[in-house]
Amino acid sequence: MAVSESQLKKMVSKYKYRDLTVRETVNVITLYKDLKPVLDSYVFNDGSSRELMNLTGTIPVPYRGNTYNIPICLWLLDTYPYNPPICFVKPTSSMTIKTGKHVDANGKIYLPYLHEWKHPQSDLLGLIQVMIVVFGDEPPVFSRPISASYPPYQATGPPNTSYMPGMPGGISPYPSGYPPNPSGYPGCPYPPGGPYPATTSSQYPSQPPVTTVGPSRDGTISEDTIRASLISAVSDKLRWRMKEEMDRAQAELNALKRTEEDLKKGHQKLEEMVTRLDQEVAEVDKNIELLKKKDEELSSALEKMENQSENNDIDEVIIPTAPLYKQILNLYAEENAIEDTIFYLGEALRRGVIDLDVFLKHVRLLSRKQFQLRALMQKARKTAGLSDLY
């Protein structure tokens, strides 16, 4: 039964980026029907636990012309997608984890895609596609061999010395204190049946056969054989644990190097900003000093002019730079004086101070003179290269 979007939102209701998580989950379960969202308790390495959603099921992986259903479990942290998911291979009872550079003995998956995870360039669909490619080159699980009893010893034939998949029959690759399937991570339920056929070697890639020490003449396994097998299993486990820690340390070192580079770049940018600010402060101080100096000069000039204002002729305050400009100024002043005179004559006529004949006589004379002044001023402005005023 497909999980609805409302059910997904309820599962990730405590997630910081709920909508992004739901959108990516819907895209994944739409494309990979065998992956199902499950809400479960995840136990961290420090012993703390948290309710998280995981995608558990199988993904199709092509290997040597056949397609195998590889069981995985993807735990989504509550800060997803800004933190990568925690990924595991989850073998069934008929499978065994094949440790390698991408999968440790606990089934945890290590990929460069996870170490370099960066939203929005990284997402669940891209992660699953990378897993399919990587697992197609190096399968993370192989089918567990069928246990076979040893035949009775015959004096005329050699003992049976070849077994699959590389361990003496009936001997676990772990000491008695370890379970066959380590459980350092939370369990994820898987659908039974079809996707994982029983134990035939054609359903999952098998490891090549190796030669081991055979049973003793009485049909039992000697203590030396058991001891050697246990030592080999423990050595392999320690070797892969050490490689896991080294890879993790290398990943942290690479992350620290990138952080150091970012800090150096940031430090350089800050130094450039400080230098630029110092230059701007120096320029502002220089402009302030210049403004103070000009203000003092203006204050001194104003004080000097105020002291001399009683002896100054108002007509001599404005002195044009050329005689032509002085002529234009005088013509303009005289023309405006005539304009004011005509205005006040009109006011006198309106109030009855003068009669109409006197008004018309003076207005006629003033208008004629005003016309002559305007014509002369237009000619002077044209000679001076100025625009027309009327």
UniProtKB/Swiss-Prot annotation:
Domain UEV, residue spans: 2-145
SUPFAM superfamilies, sorted: Endosomal sorting complex assembly domain, UBC-like
N-acetylalanine PTM sites in chain numbering: A2
Entry function: Component of the ESCRT-I complex, a regulator of vesicular trafficking process. Binds to ubiquitinated cargo proteins and is required for the sorting of endocytic ubiquitinated cargos into multivesicular bodies (MVBs). Mediates the association between the ESCRT-0 and ESCRT-I complex. Required for completion of cytokinesis; the function requires CEP55. May be involved in cell growth and differentiation. Acts as a negative growth regulator. Involved in the budding of many viruses through an interaction with viral proteins that contain a late-budding motif P-[ST]-A-P.
The family this protein is said to belong to: Belongs to the ubiquitin-conjugating enzyme family. UEV subfamily.
UniProt note: domains: The UEV domain is required for the interaction of the complex with ubiquitin. It also mediates the interaction with PTAP/PSAP motifs of HIV-1 P6 protein and human spumaretrovirus Gag protein.
Name listed for the protein in its UniProt record: Tumor susceptibility gene 101 protein
Organism: Homo sapiens (Human)
Gene name, Swiss-Prot/TrEMBL: TSG101
